[in-house]
Amino acid sequence: EEVSGPSAPAIVEYLKERGVRPAMVVDEGGAVVDGVFPGVKQPIAVVGIGEKGFMNVELTARAAGGHASTPAVPSTLGMLCRAVADCEKHQFKAHLTAPVRALFQNVGPYAPFGLRLVFANLWLFGPLLPLLAGRLGGELGAMMRTTMAFTTAQGSKQINVLPTEASAGVNLRLVNLDTPESAAQHLKDVIRNDKVEVKVTYAQNASPYASAEDANWETLAKAVGDTWQGSIVSPYLMMACSDSRHFSAICRDVYKFSAMALSKEQRGLIHNNDERIPVREIAKTVEFFTRLEQSI
């Protein structure tokens, strides 16, 4: 796997120069999952029609250093910790984007009555969306808003020395209604401290959306449904990032589907210790792509 490397952009540029425009692109993304949608017992085959943007930000607090025996208040770490806590307390606003709306409309009829009523009348229950996002949490909640995850931190290298700088890294995944600029401004507005710098170190916008209504979608959805019979096939918003986004420059319908059934436990093993795929799922993956290619 190449992470943010030069290969995919180079391939796209090569095809563009030669006038090649693929009718459809299928890359890694969603899977056949269960336990994601509250109260829905059937497995759901989620196919990404778009993916979130990606953004890295470094928060840096600065103040006078010194010896730990005579500490200054507020310290750089104190200011940084307050900034992190304020950011986590003030999450981004939830949005009903096109992929999420499609997911709710497709899966909603299989949900318990209360949720079914909400998803069948999204035009009416829109104001409940922020509350719903918070209560759903996990993967569904993350699909509805820009998320932020604090992942790195650095202060003094000596326990008895006050650092003049303390920093924390935060990774954001952006829905398409948030931009790197607006997301950075949100962090600044929440932190409200000129001594804490908000520096964007890397950013890319969310991808365009593929169609979930044209002939390409119908062909893909049928191949998925015929391979994993009994599953609910639905569009969704992919929360991770992939190199397939580059192909949006030459192809409208870029779909993100890993073509295998993955339990919650198996999804948790992705990029983790003991990552693995059952052999039987590899066979289903081959079956799916064979069926898809024969139907085109």
Question: What does each model-found stretch correspond to?
Answer:
Residues 1-46:
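Acidic/histidine-rich catalytic neighborhood of metal-dependent amide-processing enzymes
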Residues 8-15, 64, 68-93:
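A short core secondary-structure module
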Residues 20-21, 41-42, 50-56, 143-145, ...:
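Short, solvent-exposed loop/turn segments at the edges of secondary structure
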Residues 29-31, 41-56, 257-267:
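Flexible glycine/proline-rich, aromatic-decorated loop/lid segments
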Residues 33-34, 93-160, 164-165, 176, ...:
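An extended, acidic, His-containing surface patch that forms the Zn2+-binding/catalytic region
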Residues 40-43, 60-67:
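Flexible glycine/proline-enriched surface loops and loop-helix/loop-strand junctions
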Residues 61, 172-174:
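Hydrophobic beta-strand positions in extracellular immunoglobulin-like domains
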